[in-house]
């Protein structure tokens, strides 16, 4: 990460896409996409997804590392080209607890990530805990971030410190996505970004972390990009020029969250304006969902009724029976809920792919389609971009490859923006 940031600060148009997903097919796609390049791939886990207690994936940081490395070995992607990051590391998962208990767990969380070899650490102590004022004072956020940084430094080896990098910043979207419709978004003011940096510098120095400050590579701000279930707020470069100019006088770049669904031109403009770390998650699993839904429609027409997976029906049944991952995000009417379950850009389906019933139905569908020749006309109908690539000889009409290429479409836009 430090090398990439140095190149960007030296004037090169270069950025990196941060893949925020624990889905094996998304990780496989991210690694396979860059297998034949010289680029490094940044894969991040969030604190609620992966933590010392397992998170909602059931994986500790060490488990996640091995999970990613196993996929890399299968794909033929060199492990040393993978950068592992931890996102929203702090009290995010324990906001209902008092600050002492929440921070104690947060310290162990950060230590677990660093011990597992994660080298990009987002120190995010912006969440209020039980009894805290809402919002927290910037000084309090910075002091807690310094506690987390101290924890990271205390377990890092000398070799790890050479690679270790920190991201600071409090102006981040709700981890997991917006819960309501959006019409506009607040772009970070320069004075707020400057205050975030100033308060963190003061807090770090007070804890004897002056050297660690040199490892702070980025600050999280809101450049004016966001999405909800069916709306996308697109990047308006002219609105972020004050931010773009301010960061030029520092050693850092910006990290932009929720960049999903922007145009490839917007990604290029974001990187030009020093938002050099572009985080993406739901757009990748949304592309995966689109591919699976398309294949399910193809299966419906090609496979005898008694042998079909019933994949789409199974997904709806499970999500309606177990609504905990979407209930507080989606609309309440039955028809509206079904539309959101299927097609929301927030893509809460991503939390359900590991469910045994859904996983088994998808596997059945894949086996069914591997045993038949999919007519080109059907691929043109349901996966038109993939049809074009099949016609040009770039792609085969194999279900797994069709899913991979659908995810590649998202990664292609980021590659264009991050140029190298």
From Swiss-Prot:
- One GO biological process from the UniProt record? phosphoenolpyruvate-dependent sugar phosphotransferase system
Q: Does the keyword Transport apply?
A: no
- What cellular component terms from Gene Ontology apply here? plasma membrane
The record's disulfide annotation reads: none
Q: In what pathway does it function?
A: Carbohydrate metabolism; D-tagatose 6-phosphate degradation; D-glyceraldehyde 3-phosphate and glycerone phosphate from D-tagatose 6-phosphate: step 2/2
- Indicate yes or no for the key word Membrane: no
So which domain of life are we looking at? Bacteria
Which InterPro entries does the annotation name?
A: Aldolase_TIM, GatZ/KbaZ-like, GatZ_KbaZ_carbometab, TagBP_ald_GatZ
Query: Which keywords belong to this entry?
Result: Galactitol metabolism
Q: Tell me the Pfam families matching this sequence.
A: GatZ_KbaZ-like
The record's family statement is: Belongs to the GatZ/KbaZ family. GatZ subfamily.
The record's note on quaternary structure and interaction partners says: Forms a complex with GatY.
Q: What is the protein's known function?
A: Component of the tagatose-1,6-bisphosphate aldolase GatYZ that is required for full activity and stability of the Y subunit. Could have a chaperone-like function for the proper and stable folding of GatY. When expressed alone, GatZ does not show any aldolase activity. Is involved in the catabolism of galactitol.
User: In its UniProt entry, what is this protein called?
Assistant: D-tagatose-1,6-bisphosphate aldolase subunit GatZ
| The species this protein was found in | Escherichia coli O157:H7
Lineage here is: Bacteria, Pseudomonadati, Pseudomonadota, Gammaproteobacteria, Enterobacterales
Name the gene behind this protein.
gatZ
């Amino acid at each position: 990460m430090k090398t990439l940031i140095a190149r960007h600060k030296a004037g090169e148009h270069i950025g990196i896409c941060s893949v925020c997903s624990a889905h094996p097919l998304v990780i496989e796609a991210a690694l396979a996409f860059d297998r034949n390049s010289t680029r490094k791939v940044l894969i991040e886990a969030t604190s609620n997804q992966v933590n010392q207690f397992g998170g909602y994936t059931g994986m500790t940081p060490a488990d996640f590392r091995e999970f990613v490395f196993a996929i890399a070995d299968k794909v033929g992607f060199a492990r040393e080209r993978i950068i592992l990051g931890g996102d929203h590391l702090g009290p995010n998962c324990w906001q209902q607890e008092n600050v002492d208990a929440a921070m104690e767990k947060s310290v162990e969380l950060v230590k677990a990530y660093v011990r597992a070899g994660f080298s990009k650490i987002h120190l995010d102590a912006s969440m209020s805990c039980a009894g805290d004022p809402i919002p927290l004072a910037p000084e309090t956020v910075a002091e807690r971030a310094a506690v987390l940084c101290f924890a990271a430094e205390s377990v890092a080896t000398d070799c790890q410190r050479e690679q270790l990098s920190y991201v600071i910043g409090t102006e981040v979207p709700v981890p997991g996505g917006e819960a309501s419709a959006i019409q506009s978004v607040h772009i970070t003011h320069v004075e707020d970004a400057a205050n975030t940096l100033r308060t963190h510098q003061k807090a770090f120095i007070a804890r004897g972390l002056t050297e660690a400050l040199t490892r702070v590579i980025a600050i999280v701000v809101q450049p004016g990009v966001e999405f909800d279930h069916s709306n996308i707020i697109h990047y308006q470069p002219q609105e972020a020029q004050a931010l773009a100019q301010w960061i030029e006088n520092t050693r850092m770049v910006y990290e932009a969250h929720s960049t999903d669904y922007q145009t490839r031109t917007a990604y290029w403009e974001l990187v030009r304006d020093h938002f050099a770390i572009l985080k993406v998650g739901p757009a990748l699993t949304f592309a995966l969902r689109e591919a699976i839904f398309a294949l399910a429609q193809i299966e419906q027409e090609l496979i005898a009724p008694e042998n079909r997976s019933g994949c789409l029906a199974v997904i709806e049944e499970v999500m309606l029976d177990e609504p905990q991952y979407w209930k507080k995000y989606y609309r309440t009417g039955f028809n509206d809920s079904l539309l959101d379950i299927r097609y929301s850009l927030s893509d809460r389906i991503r939390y359900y792919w590991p469910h045994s019933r859904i996983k088994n139905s998808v596997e059945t569908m894949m086996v069914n389609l591997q045993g038949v020749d999919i007519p080109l006309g059907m691929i043109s109908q349901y996966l038109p971009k993939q049809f074009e690539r099949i016609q040009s000889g770039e792609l085969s009409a194999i279900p797994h490859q069709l899913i991979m290429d659908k995810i590649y479409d998202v990664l292609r836009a980021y590659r264009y923006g991050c140029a190298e």
